[in-house]
């Protein structure tokens, strides 16, 4: 039997600013170290009392609440700690500004599936699924804090463990960045001198994706650490650089399409690469297949010609629409490198000033 009550499908109605309280990301931001709610949770953990806390007091939540007592007081970490000494759940407002109810028995539909074994955690997971709002369970015996939201469960880690993991990941990311810079420079030289092979392109794409993945892992730790992650965030930004734009540029250069690739085709190729598991990513044939190139070992040494997006991207202030016009007109990077100022300025929308700027930029790069 399927439960008849459905989770909230439009969380925008309960947003605070640009942060949505119904998402894992939005809730983790509000549970970061130093926030009032996290302070209250840490007090509960230290007190070994356990807790069941619902973030939201809409009709879906009210419909499964039984007993307890209603009041409307401002949120305070100490107040939350005292109220959680009682057996029932505590209901908070969606903006976390008010404590609405306490000592409440939650009665979500028992037909919602749960993998939890403890009574408190089973109730928390089912309540989150039933209402669509975030629910927090604090284990009395294990001193752990588990968040249930968006059909997922997430156990909060101590800041020290998160910092240690993030720093280790930064070390890995630094090695990935060094290797990416090496293969990137090699590909750049090959592009300027017309000896690019498929494996040159694949090697760069592989390392760009590896850099993206480890950066995504660190993003999660940064989110959960909150204000404690400022230094890590700075290092992450430096190591990441302009990787997202560079990933789009290399796909735009080498994706096999009729004419210049559309944005949708570029994003579809990047999405396909992101779905490869780590082992599949290391197989050059899989990347070649996404690009529309022959996925054979022999074909990896075949020459390919770039359209010119990567090189034009290295020239300051050249916008994508100008790149498109130039590449439609000249076809590939070799023709662009051999074009004169007059040739470039004759392209519709380019003009003499941009033509001179682009010619000078190409000259400096080569």
Swiss-Prot record:
A GO molecular-function annotation? diadenylate cyclase activity
Q: Which residues are in the DAC domain?
A: 21-159
Q: At which positions is ATP bound?
A: 88, 106, 119-123
User: Which Gene3D superfamilies does the entry mention?
Assistant: 5' to 3' exonuclease, C-terminal subdomain (1.10.150.20), DNA integrity scanning linker region (1.20.1260.110), DNA integrity scanning protein, DisA, N-terminal domain (3.40.1700.10)
InterPro entries the UniProt entry points to: DisA, DisA/LigA_HHH, DisA_sf, DNA_integrity_DisA_N_sf, DNA_integrity_scan_DisA_link, DNA_integrity_scan_DisA_N, DNA_integrity_scanning_protein, RuvA_2-like
Gene Ontology biological-process annotations: DNA repair
Q: Which cofactor does it need?
A: Mg(2+)
The EC number(s) attached to this protein equal 2.7.7.85
Q: Which superkingdom is the protein from?
A: Bacteria
Q: Which UniProt keywords apply?
A: ATP-binding, DNA damage, DNA repair, DNA-binding, Magnesium, Nucleotide-binding, Nucleotidyltransferase, Transferase
Q: Which reaction is this enzyme known to catalyze? A: 2 ATP = 3',3'-c-di-AMP + 2 diphosphate
Q: Which family does it belong to?
A: Belongs to the DisA family.
Please describe the quaternary structure of this protein: Homooctamer.
Q: What does this protein do?
A: Participates in a DNA-damage check-point. DisA forms globular foci that rapidly scan along the chromosomes searching for lesions. Also has diadenylate cyclase activity, catalyzing the condensation of 2 ATP molecules into cyclic di-AMP (c-di-AMP). c-di-AMP likely acts as a signaling molecule that may couple DNA integrity with a cellular process.
Could you tell me what this protein is called? Answer: DNA integrity scanning protein DisA
**Source organism (scientific name):** Corynebacterium glutamicum (strain ATCC 13032 / DSM 20300 / JCM 1318 / BCRC 11384 / CCUG 27702 / LMG 3730 / NBRC 12168 / NCIMB 10025 / NRRL B-2784 / 534)
The gene that this protein is the product of is: disA
